[in-house]
Amino acid sequence: MSKTEVRKGETIEDTLRRFKRTVSKDGTLVEARKREYYIKPGVDRRMKAKAAKTKKKKR
């Protein structure tokens, strides 16, 4: 859980920018999107293999 306190003399925009930076750095949103719904292990393996194949093809 990210926690950001407003510093003295800091605007709300600056605080929000710092909060967004800490959330993206922690990977909170990525983790939430990943856990949005359950993916069976077999399906997960197939998706990862397909992504790796596509990535290799681009190189």
Swiss-Prot record:
GO terms for cellular component: ribonucleoprotein complex; ribosome. Signal peptide: none annotated. GO terms for molecular function: structural constituent of ribosome. Keywords: Ribonucleoprotein, Ribosomal protein. GO terms for biological process: translation. Pfam families: Ribosomal_S21. InterPro entries: Ribosomal_bS21 (IPR001911), Ribosomal_bS21_sf (IPR038380). HAMAP family: Ribosomal_bS21. Belongs to the bacterial ribosomal protein bS21 family. This is Small ribosomal subunit protein bS21. The lineage of its organism: Bacteria, Bacillati, Mycoplasmatota, Mollicutes, Acholeplasmatales. The gene is rpsU.
